[in-house]
């Protein structure tokens, strides 16, 4: 608990944004029951994690967005400030805007408040795949506008956070106080009192049935198969070694995004489980992003940058023996191994761009991780970053993931622009946070759906190399999308298994 004396000491030390917190038992609450009490807020999020597809991680994070939100689309930066006023300006480099914006918050380092988890707030949201166009000038040939209608980048300021310690069955209630306000400490205490009252209110998680979904590919199988052949021609010509084209599926939706999240965390527990809800600033319509991504884009923590290439896929077996046979088949597949080794090299190169010389290493090499419907080959690449590098530098060096673009990365993305009919939107981008202390954790937006204006969208891709079989690659996209589609179906049935 933050005392008034401690608060004043931190204020005197020059910190202008100070976490005021309480810790209490949470043995009768769950992250889901807490989020259910917050889900009517305009901006909110829920982050959970299952490590290796099997064990729940220590912390679950529930956050409320503040009034401050910003988004960027087609070079236009739209900002909603703390007073609710909205302005728009041209912006060639949104990353510099983010860097400048975050620099105004002087938050005490973790060492001064060691009881708190590493992440206690910051900026939360997403970078869509097309955010790469603010990084790489060659990618200026933008496909048609994304009919889903979400911006390339969307971030909310998060200063009110509830963090579950799943190991100790406790939770932290955290409110960040602005010390320029003379009543800041008392206002923070009042907000904590409000959160306590909110958590004490009854909540129902009773799921309701709604209209069953019917997903259709907007590209269609025939056009996807044609795109595979087009990509293979580029590979044969020596233009590129690998490309990862995808396609989008859509269905009508009149259900509850939280039910979809509950279904997805049951069906496909993953390292990155997330539900992000917000409103677009241009037309003030709500959206929800629900995902169970198995793959990190990049992480920066304690000066170590991490990427975790995931490539090589098989469906899960129906029996333990079949599952093991499929694992052995996957590890013996020369195409899959070649593709994965290519992506390890790409990950080493990306991390190497921001790391000290000789400080990049592969810490895990080609291990199998199992999820509900698929198994993958996974490796882990880490680097000790240079002293002049920050989280956004790491993000820009690693974005987008090679597993969602190809190699060489920029040429592969040019080909994706050619064969995919519209902007990708969130698919292949990243969802996560930029913390107060320079830490970052971003997952790749795969195994993810977007819910907006009574529609639900699911996308999936396939990594193509020279000997790819078009029919097999189409089937791979169906396998990858299966968990999310099944989650939408399960939610429509009232979560009755």
Curated annotation (Swiss-Prot):
Keywords: Amino-acid biosynthesis, Aromatic amino acid biosynthesis, Lyase, Magnesium, Metal-binding, Tryptophan biosynthesis. InterPro entries: ADC_synthase (IPR005801), Anth_synth_I-like (IPR019999), Anth_synth_I_N (IPR006805), Anth_synth_I_PabB (IPR005256), Chorismate_C (IPR015890). Binds 1 Mg(2+) ion per subunit. L-tryptophan binds at residues 49, 271-273. Its cofactor is Mg(2+). GO terms for molecular function: anthranilate synthase activity; metal ion binding. SUPFAM superfamilies: ADC synthase. It catalyses: chorismate + L-glutamine = anthranilate + pyruvate + L-glutamate + H(+). NCBIfam families: trpE_most. Part of a heterotetrameric complex that catalyzes the two-step biosynthesis of anthranilate, an intermediate in the biosynthesis of L-tryptophan. In the first step, the glutamine-binding beta subunit (TrpG) of anthranilate synthase (AS) provides the glutamine amidotransferase activity which generates ammonia as a substrate that, along with chorismate, is used in the second step, catalyzed by the large alpha subunit of AS (TrpE) to produce anthranilate. In the absence of TrpG, TrpE can synthesize anthranilate directly from chorismate and high concentrations of ammonia. Heterotetramer consisting of two non-identical subunits: a beta subunit (TrpG) and a large alpha subunit (TrpE). This is Anthranilate synthase component 1. It comes from Acinetobacter calcoaceticus. The gene is trpE.
């Amino acid at each position: 608990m933050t005392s008034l004396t401690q608060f004043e000491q931190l204020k005197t030390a020059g910190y202008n944004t100070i976490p005021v917190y309480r810790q209490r038992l949470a043995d009768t609450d769950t992250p889901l029951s807490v989020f259910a009490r917050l889900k009517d807020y305009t901006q909110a999020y829920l982050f959970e994690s299952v490590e290796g597809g099997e064990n729940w991680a220590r912390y679950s994070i529930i956050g409320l967005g503040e009034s401050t939100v910003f988004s960027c689309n087609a070079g236009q930066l739209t900002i909603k400030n703390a007073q609710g006023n909205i302005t728009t300006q041209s912006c060639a480099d949104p990353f510099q805007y983010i860097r400048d914006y975050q620099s105004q918050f002087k938050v005490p380092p973790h060492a001064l408040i060691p009881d708190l988890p590493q992440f206690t707030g910051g900026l939360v949201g997403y970078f869509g795949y097309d955010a790469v166009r603010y990084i790489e000038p060659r990618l200026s040939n933008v496909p048609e506008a994304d009919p889903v209608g979400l911006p390339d980048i969307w971030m909310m300021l998060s200063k009110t956070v509830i963090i579950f310690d799943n190991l100790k069955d406790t939770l932290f209630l955290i409110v960040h106080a602005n010390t320029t306000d003379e009543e800041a400490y008392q206002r923070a205490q009042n907000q904590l009192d409000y959160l306590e009252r909110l958590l004490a209110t009854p909540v129902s998680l009773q799921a309701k049935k709604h209209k069953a979904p019917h997903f259709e590919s907007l590209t269609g199988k025939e056009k996807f198969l044609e795109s595979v052949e087009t990509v293979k021609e580029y590979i044969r010509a020596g233009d590129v070694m690998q490309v990862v084209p995808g396609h989008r599926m859509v269905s009508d939706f009149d259900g509850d995004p939280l039910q979809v999240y509950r279904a997805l965390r049951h069906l496909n527990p993953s390292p990155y489980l997330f539900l992000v809800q917000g409103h677009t600033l241009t037309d003030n319509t709500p959206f929800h992003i629900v995902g169970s991504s198995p793959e990190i884009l990049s992480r920066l923590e304690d000066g170590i940058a991490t990427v975790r290439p995931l490539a090589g896929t098989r469906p899960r077996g129906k029996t333990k023996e079949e599952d093991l046979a499929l694992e052995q088949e996957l590890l013996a597949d020369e195409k899959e191994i070649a593709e994965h080794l290519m992506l390890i090299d790409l990950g080493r190169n990306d991390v190497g761009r921001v790391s000290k010389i000789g400080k990049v290493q592969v810490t895990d090499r080609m291990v199998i991780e199992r999820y509900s419907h698929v198994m993958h080959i996974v490796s882990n690449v880490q680097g000790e970053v240079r002293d002049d590098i920050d989280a956004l530098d790491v993000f820009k060096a690693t974005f987008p993931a090679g597993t969602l673009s190809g190699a060489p990365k920029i040429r592969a993305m040019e080909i994706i622009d050619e064969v995919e009919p519209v902007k990708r939107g969130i698919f292949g981008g990243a969802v996560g946070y930029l913390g107060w202390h320079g830490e970052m954790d971003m997952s790749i937006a795969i195994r993810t759906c977007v819910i907006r204006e009574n529609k639900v969208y699911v996308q999936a891709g396939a990594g193509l190399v020279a000997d790819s079989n078009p029919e097999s690659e189409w089937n791979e996209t169906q396998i990858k999308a299966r968990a999310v589609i099944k989650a939408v179906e399960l939610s429509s049935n009232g979560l009755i298994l």
